[in-house]
Amino acid sequence: MTNSPVKIGINPISWSNDDLPSLGGETPLSTALSEGKAIGYRGFELNGKFPKTPEGVRAVLAEYGLELVSGWYSSLLAHRSVEEEIEAIAPHCRLLAENGAKVLVYGEVAGSIQGRRIALGERPRFYTDEAWKSYGDKLTRLARFTQSQGLRLAYHHHMGAYVQAPEDIDRAMAATGEEVGLLFDAGHCYLGGGDPLAVLRKHLARVCHVHCKDVRAGVVKLSRNEQWSFPECIVNGTFTVPGDGDIDFEAILATLLTAGYRGWLVVEAEQDPAVAPSYAYAKKGFATLNSLLARLAPQHASA
């Protein structure tokens, strides 16, 4: 429904992976946008192929009748000052806010190994209470700035980064103020060692954005046994779209809807389009979420 407070969007990573150009790097943005629109998605998150100005993004999305969901921001806050980060993030805030986005996808990439072929166990960590407190204080201050720009900071817990495991999410939420929202990503939660539903219920009050990434449990087990890097997890098929993996998205959506969640459900599942064809898998992800919405809350589903 057009005015529904819950909308289904998608990330172009289903067609083209910015970090691994061998996975669909040749696919133009126009293909993703036209196919996503045809499937029924209401909006897209940004990727590296979008224009870099508010006006450019607006024009591209308008051509397809799509909304801007949000866009990833690579932060180095763990290694630099709040003032430096505010200066760096301001243009991204402007681009998002001027195109109607309400949340900013925040990724902490300081020290991250997410793009490197290094075992995930070698990721960066905060080892002391003081380190967590310092980081949390800085993050809260940065979130107040994004809030002043009309955007809720949505912290993306992510493999290969400081906040990866369920206990990291606990520490991050405890160390920050309510200004810092949580981007709940079911796939990263599972691969990071968590029970997605339990983590969601624990931090439900802070969730302001949702990435609907499914996993293939057998591949997850193999990734742990073989100590894969994050890129190896991707190319070997760890992730997939809702309805094609082992995460219970019905329980996740029911929990969100019961709590009155208002925002986007974003299909964001990086895999090799040569193995998992982009259109077919994007369609399956949409159909899964839309059918769940139709059953759980018919007013939110697309006709």
Which residues make up each language-model segment?
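Acidic (Asp/Glu)-rich catalytic clusters
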Residues: 2-5, 33-38, 51-70, 87-101, ...
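Structural preference for beta-strand elements that scaffold enzyme active sites
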Residues: 5-9, 43, 67-70, 102-105, ...
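Short, flexible, mixed-charge acidic loops at enzyme active sites
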Residues: 23-27, 110-121, 219-232
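Acidic/histidine-rich catalytic cores of soluble enzymes
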Residues: 44, 136-246, 296-303
